[in-house]
Design a protein with these regions (language model features):
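His/Asp/Glu-enriched short active-site or ligand-binding loop at hydrolase and phosphoryl-transfer sites
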Residues: 48-60
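Short acidic/histidine-rich active-site segments
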Residues: 68-80
Length: 125
């Protein structure tokens, strides 16, 4: 169906990257609640994954994620999404409006991929 696969990954990024390559995944993979370091973030991004950040995050990792690959979440937090987004924006050194634009760009990328894959599957039928 091409829907994004939302993953929780703790200390298994190498295995996750290997699995994505092995199965030749075409749908987007989003690692939610990402708390890893910048090096792990770069590896996951290089493997084509998206990263979602919540209340707890590694500031250096957050700074290496480009627009179009970044999401913000509340998952396990009692904080409101706008509070988390404000902290993320401050950490990235950007205004909240720019962060909002970056996240919207990510959503557009995810939806575009989902619709493109769904369209390809319909044409095969």
């Amino acid at each position: 169906l091409g829907k994004p696969l939302i993953l929780h990954c703790v200390k298994a990024s190498n295995e996750l990257i290997a699995l994505r390559k092995e199965i030749r995944a075409t749908q987007p993979w989003v690692v939610h609640g990402f708390r890893g370091n910048a090096n792990v973030a770069r590896q996951l991004l290089a493997a084509g994954m998206f990263l979602s950040f919540g209340e707890h995050f590694n500031a250096d990792a957050l700074k290496v994620v480009p627009p179009g690959r970044l999401l913000v979440e509340t998952d396990e937090s009692a904080m409101k999404i706008d509070e988390i987004a404000k902290r993320v924006a401050e950490t990235r050194g950007v205004p909240c409006e720019e962060l909002e634009s970056d996240v919207l760009q990510t959503i557009q990328v995810l939806l575009h991929r989902m619709l493109r894959i769904t369209d390809m599957n319909l044409k095969k039928s």
